[in-house]
Amino acid sequence: MQHTKMTQEVDLTISHHQIQVRSRDFDEELCQWGEINIKQGAVIHPGYLTFDPIPDDAFGAWVKLALTEVFTEDPNAQRRMVVPFDVLDPGKLELLSVMSDAVIELPLQEGRYALYFEICEDEEVYYRLTFVREEEYVQARYLMDDEWGGRAGEALAEGYC
């Protein structure tokens, strides 16, 4: 019997204020940050997401990915949001920043997911990306109040803005 991997950990070198998750080819236009994108800490396009990791400079951090049926909050989260993520091409699933990248090895299939993004801090900063399969549209929003201006329930704008 083949074991399907439902979790993955990536030691990612994060730089240029971005962690990207995508299921399509690189597109410079989809990487652009508008004033609202900067304020909310995310650029949201179908199959192409960019998150602000918050800390400045280049640094290494663990990014913990999971595919689950139900989202479970990390008690160490400092920021938490959910955004829609469309897997457009499972063969192009990547996690990256400017200086490093990794293939997403989770068994994500073409279709819609709720992607939960958490910035967590214990002894070190780490990130969690949790994919939950969804049939309905997912409203991008903050899920907790945070020290960078996020307010629980507040909607996040999609696209360049």
Predicted regions and their residues:
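Short, solvent-exposed coil/turn segments at beta-strand boundaries
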Residues: H45-G47, P90, E110
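A general structural signal for short secondary-structure boundary/capping elements
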Residues: L96-V98, R112, Y160-C161
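A glycine-anchored, Pro-Gly-centered beta-turn/N-cap motif
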Residues: Q109-Y116
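Short beta-strand-plus-loop segments that form exposed binding edges in beta-rich domains
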Residues: E118-D122
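Primarily secretory-pathway and cell-envelope proteins
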Residues: M1-Q78, E123-C161
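Extended, solvent-exposed segments with strong compositional bias
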Residues: E73-L108
